[in-house]
Amino acid sequence: MTPEQCEFIAGNEWIQINPQFNLDELHLICGDIGPFEAGMPIWVPLWIAVTLRKRRKCTIIPPQWLCVEELKKLVIAESGTNAFGQVPRFYLEIAHMFVQYAKEDLPDSDMIRVYVQDLWDKRSAKLNNSSTKFLGQVESCHARMDNITLMEVAYIKRSLITASREIEALNKSFHELSSQNSSDQRYVIA
């Protein structure tokens, strides 16, 4: 899965907007949305919010966690443990879409960008460390990681698969050499 695919999936998350127009209910595959009344907050999928925002038909109301204070708490919590802290689902994708399409609707957008990047850096470092430890294990062939997001899985997936294949090839070569050495020793003894 690519970051773009993760962002596409995140587009189905529901978020509040303040529409700047009036419109009856919309009947979409994902469900009915509306009616829209100018100035009255309404919940819509993020992809609709972004589309309306691009056309300047609404302002997007940031989720409660997308503010400096809450992000600061998440960064501090993430720093305080080796385990992955619980973060909002699609935090990176939603923050990215806000900064890209609705920066004006996001108070302190520059500081928010810094805290989201800091949170990502801390979590990706943990992912890399966890992956290294996992790949260094001889006996175990599975791992459990709690509280990681889809984007983080996409980030680490390719390198884990590549490294696992390399380790498998090395193990195969090692076993072939070991069996060849043991057969060579039989000829010497006999």
Swiss-Prot record:
List localization entries: Nucleus
PANTHER family named among the record's database cross-references: DNA REPLICATION COMPLEX GINS PROTEIN PSF2
Summarize the protein's role: The GINS complex plays an essential role in the initiation of DNA replication.
> Which InterPro entries did the record assign?
GINS_A, GINS_bundle-like_dom_sf, GINS_Psf2, PSF2_N
Q: Among its keywords, does the record have Nucleus?
A: yes
* Subunit structure, interactors included: Component of the GINS complex which is a heterotetramer of gins1, gins2, gins3 and gins4.
Q: Which GO terms describe its cellular component?
A: GINS complex
Which keywords, in A-to-Z order, does the entry hold? DNA replication, Nucleus
Q: Which GO terms describe its biological process?
A: DNA replication; double-strand break repair via break-induced replication
Q: Which family does it belong to?
A: Belongs to the GINS2/PSF2 family.
Lineage at the top is:
Eukaryota, Metazoa, Ecdysozoa, Nematoda, Chromadorea
Q: Which organism is it from?
A: Brugia malayi
What name goes with this protein? Probable DNA replication complex GINS protein PSF2
At the top level, the lineage of the source is Eukaryota
